[in-house]
């Protein structure tokens, strides 16, 4: 599979309609392609819209452009550390309001996302 096909498969979204526009958008930031794809599928299967980033720089750009409702960060982001990326997002007025959740192994992803989504209501 080419890099473009992989990125296209990873950047999935619920079907566009008047109803889906209001669905929460989650940005998954993770350098591991299999992890990004797995988490993306978990969330889209539950109705979330999803976009993905592979690096800290890409996370900052996509967060600024798409203004997701939540950013999930896992592992290393390659060019920037998770801490540096989070700090830059927190300092930017356009992205400072977006919750950032750092994922850790052993916890169920969807449970944590649903908990954050419920708390935001």
Stretches with model-predicted labels:
Residues 23, 67, 93-101:
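His-Asp phosphorelay/catalytic-motif detector in bacterial-type signaling
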Residues 1-32, 93-94, 106-121:
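Non-catalytic signal-transmission and effector/linker regions of two-component phosphorelay proteins
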Residues 33-51:
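Two-component/phosphorelay signaling modules centered on CheY-like receiver
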Residues 61, 83-96:
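Short amphipathic alpha-helix used as the core "switch/output" element in two-component signaling
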Residues 30, 74, 99-105:
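Short beta-strand elements of ligand-binding domains
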Residues 73-89, 105, 109-112:
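Conserved phosphotransfer microenvironments
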Residues 52-70:
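Acidic, metal-coordinating helix/loop segments flanking the phosphotransfer/catalytic sites
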């Amino acid at each position: 599979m080419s890099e473009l096909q992989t990125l296209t498969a990873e950047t999935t979204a619920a079907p566009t309609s008047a109803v889906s526009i209001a669905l929460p958008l989650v940005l998954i930031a993770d350098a591991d392609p299999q992890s990004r794809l797995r988490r993306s599928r978990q969330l889209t299967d539950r109705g979330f819209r999803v976009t993905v980033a592979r690096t800290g720089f890409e996370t900052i750009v996509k967060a600024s452009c798409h203004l997701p409702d939540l950013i999930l960060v896992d592992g290393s982001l390659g060019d920037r550390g998770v801490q540096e990326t989070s700090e830059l997002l927190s300092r930017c007025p356009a992205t400072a309001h977006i919750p950032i959740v750092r994922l850790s192994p052993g916890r169920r992803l969807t449970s944590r996302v649903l908990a954050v989504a419920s708390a935001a209501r």
